[in-house]
Amino acid sequence: MDLLSDIEKQLQKATAQGFLIALSGGLDSTVLLSLFAKLRQKQPHLPPLSVRAIHIHHGLSPNADSWAKHCQDLCDQFQIPLIIERVQVDKTNGIEAGAREARYQAIKKHLQTQEILVTAHHLNDQTETFFLALKRGSGLQGLGAMQQQSVLFGMPILRPLLGFTRTQLENYAQKEKLNWITDESNGDNRFDRNFLRNEILPKLRERWAYFDLAVQRSAQHCFEQQQLINDLLSEAFAEHCQIKNQFKLCQFRKYSLAKQTALLRMWLAENQLEMPSKRQLTQLINDVVFAKEEANPQFQLVNKVIRRYQDRLYLTKPFSDLTKYCLKLEQNTLSLPDDLGNLSVQENEHNLIFHWQDFSVTLEKTNLPISIRFGYSGKVKHHLKRPREDIKKIWQELSVPPWERNRIPLIFYGNKLKSAVGFFRVFDEY
């Protein structure tokens, strides 16, 4: 089956109303763009096949500007709208990883509802991905490599060229007289993927002509086995993960280590996190899951933090220390730090009504300066019929996790705490 008819059949099965093509300007994505342009002309779609393209300008090469212009010229030729998005690459975890993260986050920003991202990964890419997973010591999920349709970074992705080799794409490009750019970094074997592509895999293909197809079969076996495990664990997983970013630990200790790690991996995958290594997962289980009950353990995983409180794991972002903030309320609206939103105040004849997120509290008017602070230690009287109690005990009774306690706006009249917005009022002086 040729490229055009195969992709045509794939698109007939797709439920998307539009397609966003990831266009680098290289051979693979240029072929993909050409195929979609042909399909749009060939198929009597009512409405017409909706196709857009996006080019990510990483700024890593001195040729990046000329690549962007090439992509624009290409899209003008095919009459396909193009988005050019410039990104900053965080090189903390390596250029490859940083560029990939920046690329997909930029694409996610532009992907529309009912639109699917289309990438030009082919059979040779699949082999490289499998070997890189093997190098990392990945399990079934990693060795499952890429699927023709999947979800990545929360985006639906279609890879219609996954069953074709690079040679087949080259033959098509030459037949259609297509022009494409070549990234000079492709020859740099310091990058693992380039080392495999340029040094290792050509020798394996020379020895075994159908090596890529064999790797694809193995990857598919791994994917199917992982799907089977997920199916078998689905009932248990539903019991432990009733809220997406939380994981209940009740009965968890009774499971085998294999079942524990499988369930945690499912939870991390549900939250679209990269899979931790086996060492990291073991550390998570030992240091967080099974930490002492009174402990407040946490585990950093890329840009997220896993915390435990009252027999439950929580997935949060890293939080800033807000305890030194003292914000004067001089207008009706105050912007709070660390993405906590706005706190606003309304006034009537006798009272001030403070609003924050879905919470509100009504306090008497005052001539004292009003400030918003975070974090407090000491005893307060939060109930008319109860004596003063340590604020830590109050938070515990309200089941507020330790890391959230210092993120709740505290209203002060002068130097006197009057309320933790949405949780309690203070009824006496201290």
Swiss-Prot record:
- Keyword presence, Transit peptide: no
SMART domains referenced in this protein's UniProt entry, alphabetically: TilS_C
Enumerate the SUPFAM superfamilies for this protein.
Adenine nucleotide alpha hydrolases-like, MesJ substrate recognition domain-like, PheT/TilS domain
Q: Which UniProt keywords apply?
A: ATP-binding, Cytoplasm, Ligase, Nucleotide-binding, tRNA processing
Which EC class is the enzyme in? ligase
| InterPro entries listed in its UniProt record | Lysidine-tRNA-synth_C, Rossmann-like_a/b/a_fold, TilS/TtcA_N, tRNA_Ile_lys_synt, tRNA_Ile_lys_synt_N, tRNA_Ile_lys_synt_subst-bd
Q: What is its main location?
A: cytoplasm
Q: What Gene Ontology terms describe what this protein does at the molecular function level? A: ATP binding; tRNA(Ile)-lysidine synthase activity
Q: Which reaction does it catalyse?
A: cytidine(34) in tRNA(Ile2) + L-lysine + ATP = lysidine(34) in tRNA(Ile2) + AMP + diphosphate + H(+)
Annotated GO biological processes are: tRNA modification
The cross-references to Pfam families, in alphabetical order and at most eight, read: ATP_bind_3, TilS, TilS_C
Q: What are its E.C. numbers?
A: 6.3.4.19
Q: Which residues bind ATP?
A: 24-29
Does the record carry S-adenosyl-L-methionine as a key word? no
Q: A GO CC term?
A: cytoplasm
Q: What compartments host this protein?
A: Cytoplasm
What's the domain of life for this entry?
Bacteria
Q: What does this protein do?
A: Ligates lysine onto the cytidine present at position 34 of the AUA codon-specific tRNA(Ile) that contains the anticodon CAU, in an ATP-dependent manner. Cytidine is converted to lysidine, thus changing the amino acid specificity of the tRNA from methionine to isoleucine.
Q: What is known of its domains?
A: The N-terminal region contains the highly conserved SGGXDS motif, predicted to be a P-loop motif involved in ATP binding.
| NCBIfam families for this protein | lysidine_TilS_C, lysidine_TilS_N
The UniProt entry's sequence similarity note says: Belongs to the tRNA(Ile)-lysidine synthase family.
Q: What is this protein called?
A: tRNA(Ile)-lysidine synthase
Species name: Haemophilus influenzae (strain PittEE)
Per the UniProt record, the lineage of the source organism begins with:
Bacteria, Pseudomonadati, Pseudomonadota, Gammaproteobacteria, Pasteurellales
Gene designation per UniProt: tilS
